[in-house]
Amino acid sequence: MDKNFIIDQNMINYIFSHTNNLHKVQKKLLKYNEKLGHIKKLQISILQANFIQFIIKINNYKSYLEIGTFTGYSILSAALALPKNCKLIGIDKNL
């Protein structure tokens, strides 16, 4: 998580225990992003992705909007946590 966000190991363990293991597509995307050099810093961390999933699940959200998707790792993580028949929107600049 961000350096300014205080989170202890107990919270990290709790988040990981209430979220999914990495999906094979997430693993493939992380591997792809590793090859992008310094620009890979735009990707969120695995912990941040799990935190997004955790927030979606505990609040039973039915929709998710993401502005700035990079290669799609974070929105994919959100999609995996959302229930069926939900609304998922990703917006990014067309380069």
Q: Positions of the model-derived regions?
A:
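A short alpha-helical cap/connector motif
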Residues: M1-L95
